[in-house]
Amino acid sequence: MKSLNTFKSLLDIANKIIPSFRVIRFNSKVIDYELQNKTALLYIHLINDSNCDIEIRNISIVDNDKEYPVLLEPTLIKVEGGKAQYSPALPFQMNPRTSNYVYLIFRNYEGRSLEIDNLLSLKFQINRKELVINQFLPRKSYYLHNKRR
């Protein structure tokens, strides 16, 4: 019994040093039909499984052009308790043992179309540590056309 308590104590200490962070749901779809695919919305469900606060400092996606990759920084809409909080810039905090539904709006201001293909690299910076998550987008690829008119 004592060894079990010691193990739990070690887990608690490890949790404080290295927060556990999961992306449990990851979907994407194109929104804003007036812009003809110049805007993309990514919807993710973030879960902080740790016993400490975490701060997400950076979220970006990379288009799949190997020659000229482009990092896109989003506008963030965080939904808590059914209320949307609009936040034009990161970072945002997550309390221990909580989850957030997050909408990320990406707009393409490049001089060319960007192809967001099957494999999407989603890059987080959490508590000054970088986490890169590769996820498959559902069923189809789409283009983010340039936003300038």
Spans of model-derived segments:
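Short, cationic, amphipathic peptide segments
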Residues: 1-20
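Hydrophobic residues on conserved beta-strands that form the core of alpha/beta folds
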Residues: 23-25, 41, 56
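Short structured motifs
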Residues: 26-31, 85-91, 105-107
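Short, solvent-exposed loop/turn segments enriched in Ser/Thr/Gly
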Residues: 36-43, 117-118
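Short edge beta-strand/loop segments characteristic of extracellular beta-sandwich folds
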Residues: 43-47, 105
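Short, acidic/polar linear motifs in exposed loop/turn regions
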Residues: 47-52, 110
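The feature marks short-to-medium sequence segments in extracytoplasmic or secretory-pathway proteins
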Residues: 51-96
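Terminal connector regions
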Residues: 101-149
